[in-house]
Every structure is written in C-alpha cells, then in structure tokens.
C-alpha cells in the first residue's frame, strides 16, 4: 500500500513489483491500472516507470498519465520520490509535471 504525500490531494495506491520487472498499480486517485516496469538499484533501491491510459465515454483516448519513481526498500517498508505528468491523446501536456514523495508498506500474505 503506497501513500503519496500530495498536499490537499491524499490518496492511496496498491502496487505490485513482479518477478522479471513487471510493475502494476491502481489507486484511488484515477480510474484504470498503471502498467510498467521496475528494476532493482543496488542492494535496497528501486526505480519504476508506468503509464495509465484514460478513455472518455466515447471509448477514445482522453489522457495518458506517466509516472517515474525511485526509492528504497527497508524491510517491509518503502520510501521514495516520483514525478507524474499528464498528456492529452496527441502527447501535449495537460498539466505541469508534479514531483511528490511517497511511503509504503508491504501487504502481508495471510492465511484465512
């Protein structure tokens, strides 16, 4: 579970760091699923990048959110910084890029 520190816009996200570099995320701030890649950096660091496509009610692409992040794992916790940009269907910026810090905690596997 990841919590970005965005003033006035708190939200939570769930991210999966899969074997082979697969990265998936979904959050309470946007519809859709972010899909990308992640890579280890040194003994406890990581980077990830993902895109999240948004479609209008007509089924046409309306915007693309791109996130690039780096951080550190510390046991079952993580911290880092991420930059987010949002572009329209032609690639032109819809809003200025935003950089935020984030923290997160591993979701533990539990028996029923």
Describe these PLM feature segments:
Residues 6, 54-56, 86-88:
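Short glycine/acidic-enriched loop and turn motifs that connect beta-strands
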Residues 10-15, 21-28:
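Long, non-catalytic architectural segments outside compact domain cores
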Residues 12-14, 35-37, 66-70, 97-103:
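Well-ordered beta-strand positions in beta-sheet-rich domains
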Residues 84-112:
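Edge beta-strand at a domain terminus
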Residues 28-81:
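Contiguous, well-ordered beta-strand patches that form the walls/edges
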Residues 1-8:
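Tryptophan-anchored aromatic micro-motifs
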Residues 17-19, 40-41, 73, 106:
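Generic beta-strand structural signal
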């Amino acid at each position: 579970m990841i919590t970005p520190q965005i003033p006035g816009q708190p939200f939570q996200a769930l991210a999966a760091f899969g074997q082979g570099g697969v990265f998936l995320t979904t959050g309470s701030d946007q519809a859709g699923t972010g899909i990308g890649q992640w890579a280890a950096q040194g003994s406890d660091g990581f980077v990830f990048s993902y895109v999240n496509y948004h479609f209008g009610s007509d089924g046409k692409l309306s915007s693309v959110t791109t996130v690039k992040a780096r951080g550190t794992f510390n046991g079952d916790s993580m911290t880092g910084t991420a930059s987010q940009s949002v572009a329209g269907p032609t690639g032109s910026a819809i809003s200025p890029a935003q950089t935020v810090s984030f923290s997160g905690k591993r979701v533990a596997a539990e028996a029923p």
